[in-house]
Amino acid sequence: MIGSRSCRALCLRGLGSIPARRYCAGAGTVSNNDDAAKSRAQKAVHEHNTNFGFEKVSPEHKQERVKDLFTSVASKYDLMNDISSLGIHRCWKDHLIERIRPLPGQQLIDIAGGTGDIAMRFVRQAKINGLRLGVRSERETKAVVCDINPAMLAAGRARPGLSSDGQISWQEGNAEELPFDAEQFDVATISFGIRNVTHMDRVLREAYRVLKPGGRFFCLEFSHVDNPLLARMYDLYSFQVIPVMGQVFAGDWKSYQYLVESIRKFPNQQVFVEMLRETGFKCVSYENLFNGIAAIHLGFKL
């Protein structure tokens, strides 16, 4: 497995060579590609059946199967991410937090937050940024990890070295029906989770609802590679290596096969931009990481 220092160095080199791609709602003209992306976004919203990897299943069946899958992998979830990304997911999450720039007093909800990777980084970085910038707040920084799977939340609570002085709370809840009042949070995130939900449009609407005016939504997710040669190499690694590694290291071939398939079925970067715009987010943008192996999407509630 890649060590933290070498991983971060590799990640930063990759990020430095890949320009961010941004699309801001209402700016400039709309191209044919944008029209096509909007059409695919609308189609994705209105289809009755949904994808479980490459299978078409009913929405009820998908939610049940995803819940069972993550219950089975909860104790090895971080290993699952390490295998699928060669450990680089940790660097991508660090970069996401750099993009968020947490400050003291801000309130975060991490939707489908699993074992709390983003919440822990958010709380820690808010303190660091406050000291560095001389920013203080009478309100305490808070991060809520909301996940539908109690096994994932339990794995997060049991993580070694977890210490946030009560700033992190753990809430069982469905991303499609968040158990929170409207306009509660400054930042909403979902990291490597949205491709597993049944109705992405409902999740996006819920994220929009619970954000305060001026709040920001960030989505970090595996995406679509924009380099043909790299795409072929990535497909080979994904379909021929990841399931085998899942079997060897976690004793679970099927979960890792689903992981690969779910990535391929996730909307491409521009389609997801249109889905965010359809929800109501403004100044929507995305940044490719490693030529689109992953991407960070950002939208504002204005």
Language model segments and positions:
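C-terminal alpha-helical "lid/dimerization" subdomain adjacent to the S-adenosyl-L-methionine
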Residues: 220, 224-279, 285
